[in-house]
Amino acid sequence: MSDPVFFQFSTATVIILLVLFYGGTFLLSTFVNEKEESVDGFMVSSGKVGFGISAASMTATWIWAASFYGAAISGYNYGLSGPMHYGFWGALMILFIYPFGLRFRALAPNAHTLAEVMHARHGSGSQLILAVSNLMGSVISLMVNFTAAGALVAVLSPLSFQAGVLIAGIGVLSYTLWSGFRASILTDFAQVVAMMSIAVVIIPWVYFSAGGSEALQAGYDIITEEQADFFSMTAILEQGAPFFVAVLAYAIGNQTIAQRLFAVRQDLIKPTFITATLGYGSIVIGLGMLGLMALMLGIVPHEGDPNNIIPQMASAYLPPVMIALFFVLVIGSLSSTADSDLSALAAIMMTDIYGRNLAKGNPNPRKMLLLGRLTMIVATMAGLILASFALDILVMLVFVGALWGAIVFPVIASCYWNRVTNQAFIWAVLGGLLLFTVVRFELLPMTGVVAGFFEIVAAVGGGVVVGLMAFGFFGRIAGIAVGVIGMAVGIFYFSGFLREYTVLLGSLTAYGASTIICVLLSLLGKEEFDFDVINERVTSFDDDAALAAVRAADQKI
């Protein structure tokens, strides 16, 4: 089957849709504008956000446009199991973070960023490593969302890819700039309600318009045996396992998640994250089925670009009114995450770069707000420039997630184990990144002893991943037991095998190397940290007493 003819809106129609969406979102954000904005309100809504807003914001932030595109690409490439590998593991990682989130919040109820907690635990070195990695991740996330906007506009209108990228960037910045995080979570609520309502209609509409079960049944004749297998090992090793490992790192290393963790009321963390888990999984798996349908209908991605699969399916099988709703759906999803990234970047620059370092214990709230808004402007420009390269979304997701993998164990261990030192944290992250880079870019030939070494390190990483999950939900003994078993199984099965799957090998190597280095250096040290002092060192920026406490804490560190 050849590509169906695209339906395209006129330039005027697309501009009207974008103006209505971003104009309406801007008006909605004015309800939370304050003439004299507070620093804590701008960054985390003073830690008092309720259940409904928090759950919706968490869901909307995790459901970004890349979720739609990535899930569809996965379904198109890997068949029956593709959407499940993307949506299920992504949902599981939202659930995974809440037990650790309870610990982070208990240690530092007034925190603004996770890097700020690391500053109180270790000092500036560890804080800046986490902060810089978060900055890089959020800028790349902006790029991914703006890329999705450009792809959508280019397929559904006469406007260019660059025009779509530019409009999305300016639109998101317009309603986030003044009120920051408070504007982000309020608009998230409206966006997630709209996304869920539209998705429930669009998915079955495409299904029946494409011919329903009869058309898809015929598609079994044109897909491969691996694509027809729900338990395909190719899909597990090339998509499921790498993405599972990557999103685990996202859950810990992404400031947009931490920001909502520190914003929601402390007693509502668990129900908020459970609700977001269910919301994310159901929507993303459903939308990923569009990629599976495209595969079984024999559709070829427009111009060979897999990012075009979802807009291509929508334009081929939906009537104009539904295409307009689909357009709003994707624009809403990318905007809800892009505004979260801007708020996250602002919080990192305000707290971790200025508040805890450049200000030398004497931060000026007005300067912090100005810096936060300037950061949003600069970050938007950077995201727009990077988006112009139109890189593959799924590749970027796996790469950034694996990059953050080196941070996961040192961060979690620092919040539970009093022996972890600043040097152990720093060298663990640097070592993990170095070995990940060697594997991912094949700087050394993955053969013989070299490959065997990395497979052993990756086996340790696999044990760490499953061990941390067990530890979060069932405690230390279960975590250690599951981790050791996971390592043993990994050493047995990975030997001579995992070297063929570079993405997964690199991701697990980052976990394993950072864990080994962190544990060894911590055991060699003699430090025994008192976790009670974290709460004393992490304070609000909104009153004089808190600022005095910040100065005193910084002097201690």
Predicted features and spans:
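Membrane-embedded helix-loop-helix hairpins and adjacent transmembrane boundary segments
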Residues: 1-557
